[in-house]
Amino acid sequence: MATLIVLLYGLLAFGTVWLVRRQSKNHDAHRVMRNIPGPPSRSWMKGNIMQYFTRHGRAFQRDVALNYGPVVRLQGPLGRKILYVSDPKALHTIIIKEENVFEEPESTLITFNLLFGDCLVGSLGENHRRQRKLLNPVFSVNHMRHMLPMFYNVIFKLREVVMAKVRGGEKEIDVLEWTGRAALELIGQGGLGYSFDPLVSDKEARNEYGDALKAMLPALMNIESLRQILPHLVKMGPKWFRRLATDIFPNAHVQTVKHVVDTMSKRSQEIFREKKAALKSGDEAVLRQVGEGKDIMSILLRANTAASDADKLPESQMVAQMSLLVFAATDTTSNTLAHILQLLAEHSNVQSKLREELLQSGAGTGNTSYDELMKLPLLDAVCRETLRVHPPATLLVRVPRKDSILPLSEPVIGLDGTIIKDVPVPEGTEIVIGVFGSNVNKSLWGEDALEWKPERWLSPLPRAVNDASIPGVYSNLMTFLGGKRACIGFKFSEMEMKVVLAVMVSNFVFELEKEIEWNVAGVDYPTVVWDGDRPQLPLKVRVYKS
C-alpha cells in the first residue's frame, strides 16, 4: 500500500512538473510572438486576419509583406496569434525540413475533400505519399515533350476563333474567358483524354464545366467564415443529413459551390467509366479516344492496374484526382495567362520585343521542340517575372502538429527592441506562407523588387537570391511552393503558358483601355470594377501586321 501511495505521489509530482514546464514554455512562446511586429488590429474580437483573406485584401497583403519584416504577427478572432512568414530559413523548416510537422489546417483538408473527394491535396502521410508516387511520372519533362503537339493543336483553334473576331478590325475581347476555355480544353485532352470545348465562337458550344469552375472561386471567398467551422459541420449527423442541410441552406454562394462540386463529380465519374471501359476493350478502343491513350488519366489507370496492392489507389481516389486536375489546371494557369497579357498590354515595348523573339524562333508555328520553347529567353523571363510579382495563389496556411521553433536567416527586432533569432511556435499556431513576401523581398531581389521587369531574368540574379536557399521548386520563387507538397503540375502549367503566348503574341497585338481590379481568392481573379460580380479581363485585340 505504501509503495502504491509513493508511486501515486511520484506520478502527481511528475505531472505537476510537466504541466508547469509546458505552461512556462507556452508563456515564453506567446511572449515572443507578442513581441513580433505586425499591423494593428481593429478589434480583439475579430482580429485583422480577415483583412488578409478578404476579396479586397491585396493592399493589406502588400502592407504585411513589405512593412514589418520577414516574420509578421497577425491577429485572429478572440486575440488568436497568427504568423506571416517569408524568411527563407523559416520557410525551409516549414516546407522541407519539418514538412511532416507543419501541415495544412484541418479546415483546408476537409474543404479539398468536400470539393474533390479523397485527392492528393486533401491527404496527408502515407495516403499522400501513395497518391503522389503514382502521379509524379505523368508530370515529368519527358511526358511534357510528348504532349507538346497536342498543346499547339488546341491553341491553334484558339488563334482561329480570335482571328475570326478581329479580322475586320480591332475588337474588345475578354481574354480571361478564352484563356479559361483553352486551359480547360488542354487539361481535358492532355489530362483526361476528353474534349470539353471545341473552342468555337458561339457560346452554345461552351461546356457547363468551364462556367461552373469560374464561378467557384468567388463563391468560396464569400463563404470563408463558414469554411472555418467545417471541422465541426462535417461531424453533424450522417452524410445524407449533411447533404439535405446543404440542399436547403439559404445562401446563394453555398448553392453555387454545391452546383460546381456536383458538376465536377458527375463529369469525372462519367469520364472515368468511359476510360476504364476503353482500357478493358483493348488498344483500338483507347486509340479512338481523344488523348489516344497518352493522356494523364489513361497512363494513371494503366499504372494503377500494374501497381502493387500497397501502392494501388481505389477508384474513388482516381476519380478525385480527375476533379482536382481539372480545377487546379484551369483557373491558376488561365488567370496567370490573362495577367501576363494585361502586363504585356501595359508594357508595349516588352510585348514588341517578345513578339520579335517569337517570330524569329518560329515558336508560334508549332515547329519548335519542347527544349527550344523552354529556352526562349524573353518568353521565359516574362513568365518567371509574372509568377514572381503576381503569384496566383497567396492564401496558403500551415499549422504545426507539435511545439516547434522557426530559425531565422536574419534576426528580427522585437517591438521592445530585443533581437529575436528564432521564433518558438506553439502547437496549432496558424502560419501564413509568405509567398508574395518572399518573391518581392527587397533584401534579396533589390530595391526594384516590386517592379515587373522581365529583363532581370536575362542576366544573373542577385547573389543574395541564390545564397538564400529559398525552398521553392521553381526559379527561387515560392509561387509553386516546394518539398513533397509542391505543385505537382507546374511543368504542365509552364508549357501551357508558353505555348499560348507563343501563338497568340505572334499573331495579335494587345492593348488595355479599362482599369482592371485583381481580387483575392484561392486563385486571384480579375474584374473590371472594384465590386464586379463577373471575373473578366477585356483587352483591345487586333491582328499583328509586320
From Swiss-Prot:
Signal peptide: 1-22
Keywords assigned: Glycoprotein, Heme, Iron, Metal-binding, Monooxygenase, Oxidoreductase, Signal
One Pfam family per UniProt: p450
Superkingdom field: Eukaryota
GO molecular function, one term: monooxygenase activity
Amino acids binding heme: 487
Entry-listed glycosylation sites: 367, 441
Protein name: Cytochrome P450 monooxygenase 219
Organism for this UniProt entry: Postia placenta (strain ATCC 44394 / Madison 698-R)
Lineage: Eukaryota, Fungi, Dikarya, Basidiomycota, Agaricomycotina
